[in-house]
Amino acid sequence: MSSPLIPVILSGGNGTRLWPLSREEYPKQFLKLTDSISMLQSTISRLDSLNTSSPVVICNELHRFIVAEQLRHLNKLDNNIILEPSGRNTAPAICIAALILKMKHPNENPLMLVLPADHSVKKVKTFCNTIKSAIPFAEAGNLVSFGIKPTHPETGYGYIQKGKVLSDSDIYEVSEVRTFVEKPNLKTAESFIEKDEYYWNSGMYLFSVERYLQELSLYRPDIVKVCQETVKNIHYDMDFIRLDDKIFRNCPQESIDYAVMEKTKDAVVATMDIGWNDVGAWSSLWELGKKDSSGNVITGDIVCHETENSYIYTESGLVATIGIQDLVIIHTKDSLLVSRRDSVQNVKNIVQHLDLSGRKEHKEHREVFKSWGRCDSIDSSEKYHYQVKRITVNPSENYRCNYIITVRNIGVVVMGIAKLTVAEEIKILKENESVYIPAGIKHSLKILDNTTCVNRSLDRFLSC
């Protein structure tokens, strides 16, 4: 391969249709929904058989520490996280990545493999072989989209109509693109299934940095102009690449399909059957999951009796069901969702209601993730003025309290060893040892071994 192949992972979605597990501050791409690792990690790991460079991940600034931690677990953290201060859709996001890669590879023309972070692929070998087959077309200057062989009439996806076949084998086919089709109605989708020339538009792409910038400059020079100005003012912060919000917010919002793929004369489509799913709803996870003899997909401490064809998940605590069928039941530490499987697309209406009601359950989980670890709000009472949190600090990290003058603290080490600095005094705390921290005193916590969990009781409310 003459050109470096660089995965560009789009990780900016909120996944509201998978509430209550997916939330604004911890959306579905960071969850372990279909594997023992997160969807973001799966997206990167399934490329292991390809000779790729370190991935570039584009994400919301709010999710930066989650992305960094998940990349660190894969040993893929390499100053490669681009932080979007505001979402401007896929065309500008990919443009920013292309301009940064052009800067980093001044004497090369890397290939960008653009992938959403939250898709599921069952046939990984076929997927990778199809990418390999598409590389020569991208190196020749084509813009490659990846089409999925449809398994049913689907009104939630766009379609690609293929034209003249350029290359094929038993597992893949590369063709000219005849047209892109917007999300159809059911009757039209049913007609597509009867033909062998329509494929789901997967939202995955392969092209060189230069060709994407050339085509975007041709059709949307306004986007390129703002992105160029943004990249001139990027700021490197640890493993993050920060964009100037004042500049980037002026960028028009546009998808790559509208901006480039539907207009370019050099689009080709690599079609494949890879067991693909965009995991857009709980019903998708029921379809993907391993079912018991009654057709149920269950995760967690669950007892089922006379229960059929249901998806049941519990994050904490026992869930028991009797005499139900075709339901989705999702139980988290602070919320419970019960829905018919054929109605779960409407969970977004619940999220909108929570937002309009000023609630927080659609935004954050009870347990939140920080740069230094995580914090679980176990219990609280405004009436009795206390709050109990379980704080877990990562190895070699420091936790510094955002102290408030009226707050008193009692800290208990549940597991591990910690060095606690209270004002100027240093204390070493081991398991089951506690310390009292008076109101208004600065304090910080440093971990001395691999795992430490600290339980803190507060008499006022304060953020971690």
UniProtKB/Swiss-Prot annotation:
It comes from Escherichia coli. Gene3D superfamilies: Jelly Rolls, Spore Coat Polysaccharide Biosynthesis Protein SpsA, Chain A. Pathway: Nucleotide-sugar biosynthesis; GDP-alpha-D-mannose biosynthesis; GDP-alpha-D-mannose from alpha-D-mannose 1-phosphate (GTP route): step 1/1; Bacterial outer membrane biogenesis; LPS O-antigen biosynthesis. This is Mannose-1-phosphate guanylyltransferase. GO terms for molecular function: GTP binding; mannose-1-phosphate guanylyltransferase (GTP) activity. Belongs to the mannose-6-phosphate isomerase type 2 family. It comes from the Bacteria. InterPro entries: GMPP_N (IPR049577), Man1P_GuaTrfase/Man6P_Isoase (IPR006375), Man6P_isomerase-2_C (IPR001538), ManC/GMP-like_b-helix (IPR054566), Mannose-6P_isomerase_type2 (IPR051161), NTP_transferase_dom (IPR005835), Nucleotide-diphossugar_trans (IPR029044), RmlC-like_jellyroll (IPR014710). Its EC number is 2.7.7.13. It is an enzyme of class 2 (transferase). Involved in GDP-mannose biosynthesis which serves as the activated sugar nucleotide precursor for mannose residues in cell surface polysaccharides. This enzyme participates in synthesis of the LPS O7 antigen. Keywords: GTP-binding, Lipopolysaccharide biosynthesis, Nucleotide-binding, Nucleotidyltransferase, Transferase. It catalyses: alpha-D-mannose 1-phosphate + GTP + H(+) = GDP-alpha-D-mannose + diphosphate. Pfam families: ManC_GMP_beta-helix, MannoseP_isomer, NTP_transferase. One of its GO terms (biological process) is O antigen biosynthetic process.
